[in-house]
Amino acid sequence: MITPQEALTRCIEHREIFHDEMLHLMRQIMQGQISPVMAAAILTGLRVKKETIGEISAAAQVMREFANKVPVADRENFVDIVGTGGDGSHTFNISTASMFVAAAAGAKIAKHGNRGVSSKSGSADVLEALGVNIMLTPEQVGQCIEETGIGFMFAPTHHPAMKNVAPIRKEMGVRTIFNILGPLTNPADAPNILMGVFHPDLVGIQVRVMQRLGAKHAIVVYGKDGMDEVSLGAATLVGELKDGEVREYEIHPEDFGLQMISNRGLKVADATESKEMLLEALTNVPGTPREIVSLNAGTALYAANVADSVEDGIRRAREAIASGAAQEKLDQFVRATQQFK
């Protein structure tokens, strides 16, 4: 089996670390069996040579092995809405707002998230600001999914082995393979996913990684204005896995009868501002927040196979917002999480 030194040499020579070797290497890193210096060197080497689909798939497989799983009985219309973050756009939590709308329209959501690292407000930060208890056990998350159709999995609770890697990542302070592994390692094993990424190259890579990991319907998006969401301010690159086949294409707001609007008005300074904008969208206040949430929730409903198309999904999302069902879903979710305090 490959040694850490051999793995580093491969990276320096821009050669691939093969699947079984990567499994072995990642298990060692996750268990703290490789020194911090060597682990940091390998993570840097992988980034410089550019991680391959095979390397990312193997690394994600190991993270899933080490995760505390969430028990879910009914997996139909079950979807994760997640972003890699790191897009530098500092917008409000669009995917978190979209989760309540999609759930109100019939999807089941298993959202996997954390506190903000590069963003002003991570999904965990805004959910806490809304009154959600994020410190649930895997069993309690499963119960929330049963009761409300939504589960939020706070990453540190579900990935305890990351404690061996966290200090290394923090000291390095640069992007590593772990930045793209989070969205691939849903502890509830959601078979469908809407994933936003921070770089156009990742669209084709991540959708093919999801294919290798056995996803059913995966939609990976990158807004050409730099957003890790479906954008209103520019075209969005899409990688879609459906029925075992991968397609890559572009979508535009106008395709769905939406006006192209700059995302500048979506920027926030902290979790409190993000909460206010999220509530605007859910309570049907006309404006860009409501429009971008309708677009992303609609795409999530298509990914969850609740809607036949993104257009159909947007229509369902708008209905969920206008009827008050999305706001009620948020209130229901807050109550469900608070019962475990």
Swiss-Prot record:
Keywords: Amino-acid biosynthesis, Aromatic amino acid biosynthesis, Glycosyltransferase, Magnesium, Metal-binding, Transferase, Tryptophan biosynthesis. This is Anthranilate phosphoribosyltransferase. 5-phospho-alpha-D-ribose 1-diphosphate binds at residues 83, 86-87, 91, 93-96, 111-119, 123. It holds the Pfam family Glycos_transf_3. It catalyses: N-(5-phospho-beta-D-ribosyl)anthranilate + diphosphate = 5-phospho-alpha-D-ribose 1-diphosphate + anthranilate. Anthranilate 1 binds at residues 83, 114. Mg(2+) 2 binds at residues 228-229. Anthranilate 2 binds at residue 169. It is an enzyme of class 2 (transferase). SUPFAM superfamilies: Nucleoside phosphorylase/phosphoribosyltransferase catalytic domain, Nucleoside phosphorylase/phosphoribosyltransferase N-terminal domain. Belongs to the anthranilate phosphoribosyltransferase family. Homodimer. Pathway: Amino-acid biosynthesis; L-tryptophan biosynthesis; L-tryptophan from chorismate: step 2/5. Binds 2 magnesium ions per monomer.
